[in-house]
């Protein structure tokens, strides 16, 4: 049977996180989600290992949440971990993901149901989403030692504010990623050099993104001058 144009378009949308995000996700004002050029570059990057050195307000949380939702929505039986130094970092991402679920019935319908008909959105002891295709997204804070990571074995990991993970947490995190899995690390650098995060930013095994704050199309010269004065320069 010949593939219809509608089926061809759907296949293209599902295979591309940018097209998928534009089709399924929304901005807070209710308009359809769109992405800045630097966000598109990240979302379409095929590298297994990605690390960021980002400024403020460049939209990294939007990219992380888009990629995580796209992965879970389109990967049968996939398991992914969203990790961050502390629960407060995760709460921002969780809030964005819950907003998207509430905004699109098709997305909410992709969440599996309990035997009582309730969505499998678990909040205790840690936030977890289970999807009808068998995919699971885990959200875990690293804490000092990465104890919350130790029971997991996943195919994809997203790290928010990776510069602030402790060395022991990094070790625990690496052990929960399956061989051949994908690791995407997002962070604003903290200036510390004797760390796993800093070492990975110069590793040949990682594709490095550097996003200064002025990549944000809404950035202003006044805001740039303010931060340059505060930090003493661009470096």
Protein language model features and the residues they cover:
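Phosphate/NTP-binding elements of NTP-utilizing enzymes
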Residues: 2-235
